[in-house]
């Protein structure tokens, strides 16, 4: 096994592990906000790691530059966290409750200020 194959294998294993952690978080976390956090953080980094391994494989082993993979990595990196944030805000706005043991609600203050300012 060459050094390139070891590096690529490490990226694939890291990506698989992070995706597994995201899947476990989606199942185990008690509310929609925790589940969104698990899905957007660890699963996104897992997908990016696997795509980076794919890019390195084609570039270093086969000598082919696959720009579409780099664009896909950039697209996932930029859009997945924003989509998770928007889904969380939407859930909050329609009244999906926080977990009863949650200790902090940062959006409550912001929405109270907006409601006072609109009157």
Swiss-Prot record:
Transmembrane region(s): 7-29, 44-61, 66-88
UniProt subcellular location: Cell membrane
Membrane topology field: Multi-pass membrane protein
Pfam annotation, one family: PhaG_MnhG_YufB
Keywords, ordered alphabetically: Antiport, Cell membrane, Hydrogen ion transport, Ion transport, Membrane, Sodium, Sodium transport, Transmembrane, Transmembrane helix, Transport
Gene Ontology cellular-component annotations: plasma membrane
Recorded GO MF terms: sodium:proton antiporter activity
The keyword Ion transport appears for this protein: yes
Membrane as UniProt keyword: yes
InterPro entries cross-referenced by the UniProt entry: PhaG_MnhG_YufB
Function of the molecule: Mnh complex is a Na(+)Li(+)/H(+) antiporter involved in Na(+) and/or Li(+) excretion and Na(+) resistance. Na(+)/H(+) antiport consumes a transmembrane electrical potential, and is thus inferred to be electrogenic. Does not transport K(+), Ca(2+) or Mg(2+).
NCBIfam families, A to Z: CPA3_mnhG_phaG, PRK12674.1-2
Further facts: Mrp-dependent antiport apparently occurs by a secondary, proton motive force-dependent mechanism, but the similarity of several Mrp proteins to membrane-embedded subunits of energy-coupled NADH dehydrogenase complexes raises the possibility that there is a capacity for electron transport that could provide a primary energy coupling option for Mrp functions.
Subunit-level organization: Forms a heterooligomeric complex that consists of seven subunits: MrpA, MrpB, MrpC, MrpD, MrpE, MrpF and MrpG.
Family designation: Belongs to the CPA3 antiporters (TC 2.A.63) subunit G family.
Protein name: Na(+)/H(+) antiporter subunit G
Organism of this sequence: Alkalihalophilus pseudofirmus (strain ATCC BAA-2126 / JCM 17055 / OF4)
Name of encoding gene: mrpG
């Amino acid at each position: 096994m060459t050094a390139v194959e070891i590096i690529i294998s490490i990226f694939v294993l890291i990506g698989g592990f992070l995706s597994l952690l995201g899947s476990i978080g989606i199942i185990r976390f008690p509310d929609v906000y925790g589940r969104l956090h698990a899905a957007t953080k660890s699963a996104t980094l897992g997908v990016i790691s696997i795509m980076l391994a794919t890019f390195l494989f084609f570039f270093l082993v086969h000598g082919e530059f696959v720009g579409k993979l780099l664009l896909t990595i950039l697209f996932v990196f930029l859009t997945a966290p924003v989509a998770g944030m928007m889904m969380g805000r939407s859930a909050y706005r329609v009244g999906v409750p926080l977990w009863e043991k949650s200790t902090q609600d940062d959006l409550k203050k912001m929405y109270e200020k907006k409601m006072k300012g609109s009157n």
